[in-house]
Amino acid sequence: MSKLNPYFGDFGGQFVPQILIPALEQLEAAFIAAQQDPEFQQEFQDLLKNYAGRPTALTLCRNLTKGTKTRLYLKREDLLHGGAHKTNQVLGQALLAKRMGKNEIIAETGAGQHGVATALTCALLNMKCRIYMGAKDVERQSPNVFRMRLMGAEVIPVHSGSATLKDACNEALRDWSGSYDKAHYLLGTAAGPHPYPTMVREFQRMIGEEAKSQILAREGRLPDAVLACVGGGSNAIGMFAEFIPETSVRLIGIEPAGLGIETGKHGAPLKHGKLGIYFGMKSPMMQTDEGQIEESYSISAGLDFPSVGPQHAYLNSIGRADYVSITDDEALEAFKTLSREEGIIPALESSHALAYALKMIHQAPDKEQLLIVNLSGRGDKDIFTVHDILKSRGEI
């Protein structure tokens, strides 16, 4: 059986307790076989099309770019069933779990979007489902918690550590190490131990594949840049993968600058972290001077992750992709702008990517540029957060 490379340059690997190695090897073998199995691919494609609603639209912004020479398109992953790009790869991994004869799913979630995608998929495929979620996130994402429970998932709040995504990840891995014979750990992003970063990329790459053929059909040329927000990095790698060989296309990943990089309250390990080993992989991460994992911070729960997927670390190291950061306030502004100008309410995560695109547009209004922003999710889950912030500022 051929093996996949566990590394992207110096990044990635498989740093897990010995007890989990057989489970990861089984997963890699099943993934390789499934990728070459027309029956598996057909079932996956059928679910993507007839259950999740692919292909998603590529929408030209009519009003945001008025008075400029930019054409800005949004790849509408917010229209996918479940409300975000997460559903794509969850369907893929769940089918893989069934193929391995496993009928229980363990998952972690931050914003709750991965949890919702996992819950709906498990309901559809008749699988048992337990989802670990930081107690803080349970509080700030109550609509998604109810959605998960409504669809039959067990949601387990995690109170240890900072009670956010990284702690939920730790608990999920702990659970899996005692139950991997019957349970599959359905990791929610393109990070973690090999083969997850590769597998999640492949189960998300239709985002970029569709966007590429859609933009060629609409504009007759490739975009000048594609932009996506980066937490763990699955929506971004799904958008970037197809464009990596197209060297004329700039790849721009947007990390959360939170309250400002200088405050230390951010989630931008690619540009402001140090190389370390965490969550089963070697990648840049936010660390204290003693080398402990530092708490990340972002207004958006889905970007509140102290590390980043290894392929992004690699693309950054070779200069193929540029990584920048956007603050909470800039993301909020973009959230309001898209809602008011185009009638589309974006997730706060996606608002980071949009905010950087708006910066590019306003810095060079006379520059003819063709941009695609991956609108990775819809903002329904964030309206209470945004409402409370705007109310406290006297804006509503």
UniProtKB/Swiss-Prot annotation:
Gene3D superfamilies, alphabetized: 3.40.50.1100
Keyword terms: Amino-acid biosynthesis, Aromatic amino acid biosynthesis, Lyase, Pyridoxal phosphate, Tryptophan biosynthesis
Domain of life: Bacteria
UniProt cross-references to NCBIfam families, sorted A to Z: trpB
UniProt source species: Photorhabdus laumondii subsp. laumondii (strain DSM 15139 / CIP 105565 / TT01)
Self-association and partners: Tetramer of two alpha and two beta chains.
Pathway annotation from the record: Amino-acid biosynthesis; L-tryptophan biosynthesis; L-tryptophan from chorismate: step 5/5
Protein name (Swiss-Prot/TrEMBL): Tryptophan synthase beta chain
